[in-house]
């Protein structure tokens, strides 16, 4: 059964969503992210993808106090991302209650540090964030496109011990127009044992079912929940 992971993105301490990663297209959904997290937990959700969008832009962790509050007031298993660029950032994230962290930009900009994280904390705690636009990896809050192509990028980090990958097609993110199922199928075809988590574009239960059929291990859902395209009670069938 596909694992359901709900997302909370943070800007200035508030729960927001962007469209295609554009900071100018920001919509605030709740002044208190903890309130959102508690509601998720009330409906049986166990996994939370918490994104520090301020941190992603600033290149260092910013909203760790929000992480701390959610971790101390819920039992959600939190994976944290955004602005993790140094050992001290990682230490703050884990000390604040994250069970896992996702590294994307760091894997491109400073692979040596990211390799050390994998070796030190293990592949169960360190996830690879493979965020792409037109099959090219994008970094720094998706504001910068690189020349790294998605498939070789994932393949390289699999060799270094990564087992779990969150793959976001930026063009789909926040659009509520369906996911990049074909891209995910291609990744799975190349590497059948990868724990692949889809992110971006989920708009309805059908999208989740299609991802499950394609062999995805997990799916991150954001705007579809906030815009009530998917009701939290509908997710119970996946035994979150």
From Swiss-Prot:
Predominant location category: cytoplasm
SUPFAM superfamilies membership: Ribulose-phoshate binding barrel (SSF51366)
Subcellular location: Cytoplasm
Cross-referenced Pfam families: His_biosynth
A GO CC annotation given for this chain: cytoplasm
GO biological process: L-histidine biosynthetic process; L-tryptophan biosynthetic process
Keywords linked to the UniProt accession: Amino-acid biosynthesis, Cytoplasm, Histidine biosynthesis, Isomerase
InterPro entries associated with the record: Aldolase_TIM, His_biosynth, HisA_bact_arch, Isoase_HisA-like, Isoase_HisA-like_bact, RibuloseP-bd_barrel
Involved pathway(s): Amino-acid biosynthesis; L-histidine biosynthesis; L-histidine from 5-phospho-alpha-D-ribose 1-diphosphate: step 4/9
EC top class, as a word: isomerase
Active site per database record: 9, 131
UniProt similarity note: Belongs to the HisA/HisF family.
UniProt-listed NCBIfam families: 1-(5-phosphoribosyl)-5-[(5-phosphoribosylamino)methylideneamino]imidazole-4-carboxamide isomerase
The protein, known as: 1-(5-phosphoribosyl)-5-[(5-phosphoribosylamino)methylideneamino] imidazole-4-carboxamide isomerase
Native species: Azobacteroides pseudotrichonymphae genomovar. CFP2
